[in-house]
Amino acid sequence: MSETINTAAQFPSFEKPTVQFNERGWGPCELPDTFKDVPYQPFSKNDRLGKICDWTSTSNNDKKYQNKYASSFGTGNQYSYYHEEDETTFHLVDTARVQKPPHQRGRFRNMRGRGGRGRNPRGGLNNHHHHGMTTLNGKNVKARDTRRGMGKKFGHRGPPPKMRESSVAVRADWASIEEMDFPRLIKLSLPNIKDGVDIATCGTLEYYDKTYDRINVKNEKPLQKIDRIVHTVTTTDDPVIRRLSKTVGNVFATDAILATIMCSTRSNYSWDIVIEKVGDKPPTDDDSSCNSPRNLAIEATFINHNFSQQVLKTGDQEAKFKFEEPNPFISEDEDIQVASVGYRYKKWELGSDIVLVARCEHDGVLQTPSGEPQFMSIKALNEWDSKLANGVEWRQKLDTQRGAVLANELRNNACKLAKWTVQAVLAGSDQLKLGYVSRINPRDHSRHVILGTQQFKPHEFATQINLSMDNAWGVLRCIIDLVMKQKDGKYLIMKDPNKPIIRLYDIPDNTFDSDDSDDGEGDDGEGFQQVYNYANNSNKI
């Protein structure tokens, strides 16, 4: 018995497709029926793909780049397809020559005249074709920079302008007396001001520890928290100034106030100073207002206080330099550890019967090989986050490129460095010691390390940072003369937070008198506890 098995029914059949062979080029020989009579638009693979449609938006909000999804291929008229009658595409060709505006004629041509070879005798634009260089004089350079700045402004390029807050809220009952813009203040000058004469010296200074000069990035040292009291007493509360005001001087201030006024043209942030003008007697009120500064300001003050005390030789067995009088801000029944500060009261004659008396400070003293003491002003620069501050990494460049680090700090903190320099010059310090202090972790603002130190002579450093003491004295004398013309009362000088302008206000006598009752409120969110009593920005002269 035999069976016949049909194997053809068990396997699927394979039909060979038709493959067209084009002998004259690439692609198919014939177009399929489904694609006949369809217009063809050339395209590019680099075209950006966007949304097919958006039914939720009625208009295009992206006005800056309205054609960002448009095709970049075939944009010419020869590739465009218009589904309309042929008669509408007919147009006449205008062969008339277009008259150019007169101001565009010869705009960038080589100017040759009586001035010589390619030289404009009137100081215009000289376009020499040597090596493709263009020479601009001063006026044209300023015009070019102005055009560039306007282009950026109208193009809305870059981040939005940062609006800074005012250091104090201007009240409705304050009368504006004068506005002094920075361009006018920069031109002021008061030359030939002699060095101040010492009237009184108070306090005790400790000697500098030279081992801190050997600190570098690889041999860093933690910044310690020094539990010492630094008295920040206002001018009106200073007992020495009250005593000296009976015999000498008619303008009284501190070195910090003078430095703020002298370096006002370099400031960007708002600040304010309270001025009290009285008759021939010093003011009698004993109130001192106090504010809570922001975290970075607190951190910088915290670092400066601890660094200036840590680099000194502390201890009962260590030698100390004592001035003629003790610290005037310590009472006899006070048993506290006071920071190393030396007070030097000096006077300057500014002309026109104006005698300035100011309290200046030294932070330390250094013993020279000859045995003579050298007084020091010790300050600290702090690094909080180089990426956010547009700075350089201190741990990478401090040992090899310290000049680049200092140049970056001069760019970011020009006003602060100038104020430190002016304070050192006014006090007569022999050295200005700068310390470089950085956070251990950029997110931890309570722990720091010392990465290095650097010292300068104050007058030489002032020349390096282009700080003119003649201009500083001129700005101070201008403000003193302006206040002297006013009647007796209380005034406030404030830097505008967003404009290079200083304003003088006539304020009521009871202004800021109630600030002491608000002291300590709103400080719960601060990242640092007050190491000592911080002075308010509203300093009193």
Curated annotation (Swiss-Prot):
One of its GO terms (cellular component) is nucleus. Belongs to the eIF-3 subunit D family. It comes from the Eukaryota. Pfam families: eIF-3_zeta. GO terms for biological process: cap-dependent translational initiation; formation of cytoplasmic translation initiation complex; regulation of translational initiation. This is Eukaryotic translation initiation factor 3 subunit D-1. The RNA gate region regulates mRNA cap recognition to prevent promiscuous mRNA-binding before assembly of eif3d into the full eukaryotic translation initiation factor 3 (eIF-3) complex. Component of the eukaryotic translation initiation factor 3 (eIF-3) complex. The eIF-3 complex interacts with pix. It comes from Drosophila persimilis (Fruit fly). Residues 98-136 are annotated as: Disordered. It is found in: Cytoplasm. The keyword RNA-binding applies.
